[in-house]
Amino acid sequence: MEDILPLLNINTPYKQRISEINTIIKKPNSKYSLLNLTVVSSTLKYPKSVYSISPLGLQNSKRNGKDGIVLFGYERKKENSSSENNININSETNDESTVKDFLFNDFIFPIEGNEDNNGLYESPNFAIYYNLEDNNYYIKDFNTGVGALMKIKKYVMEGNTLINIGGNYLVVYIEKNRILIKIFNNSILENTQLKDSNCDIKQINLEENSNSYTSIGRSQHCDIIIEDMLLSKVQCCIEYNSKTKKIYLCDGDGKKESTNGTWVFILNPTKITDNFMFKAEHTLFVANLAMK
């Protein structure tokens, strides 16, 4: 688990982190939040619809790390060698039957149908973790799977941003005097790589002392038109504030929300707030917080 911590921007040594979490849990009258994760909809079959997360981690996790980190991914195949923190071997016998499945993830995504994972999903896809510094839960994608995306209303874009709207993916590059947008259709993306030859490229020019508003949707009145019936007439918009020098991605037209939502890949640690909605692996989740 030590190699996971830097990916989550956690600087506390692993054993010290566990000790500090246990102190919070065991302290009399200690107040901390619990996170309930609800499966709203999915093409996969889950054993239950609500999962509870505490500062220790996912309740009833087979990994049982109690480190405040919940790793999301697929179940790994059996391993013959032992490894600390992710395999349990009965020390009283060397019987191979005592070697349990190699479980590296806490939240296990069901495999569709009867297909075998063939070792393709050995690494966690993303994580939810408890931050000891501000006592909040955060989510971070590891960029190893399909990806975790959060539903946004108004989002500050800094650097490059990957957006999903309807059946399209938008890669947004923020440069000094312009915003470059590469639009990939999902049907093309499934069979090809993110190459310029496979996308439609749009550009927004930025003027230092002038605000700008760019609408994106299927309406012919939008500044950037994408022909996709899954999109609203105005699906989202990009706003530039010349005073703050900030660039915002807004769902809908900035006032009225879109029908299917605007989604951003969670490439940076993001705080989970009440009613936080995200999707991953054909599953839509909503997070709710409650005080202990």
Predicted regions and their residues:
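C-terminal functional regions that serve as terminal interaction/effector modules
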Residues: 258-267, 283-289
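Short acidic-glycine-tyrosine-enriched beta hairpin
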Residues: 154-162, 268-277
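Intrinsically disordered, low-complexity acidic Ser/Thr-rich regulatory segments
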Residues: 1-124, 129-134, 150-226, 287-292
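Short hydrophobic/aromatic patches on the structural cores and recognition surfaces of FHA
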Residues: 72, 124-130, 136-140, 144-148, ...
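Short alpha-helix capping/helix-loop boundary micro-motifs
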Residues: 148-152, 223, 264-266, 270-271
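C-terminal interaction modules of eukaryotic adaptor/scaffold proteins
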Residues: 274-292
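Internal, well-ordered interaction modules that form the hydrophobic cores of assembly/scaffold domains
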Residues: 221, 229-234
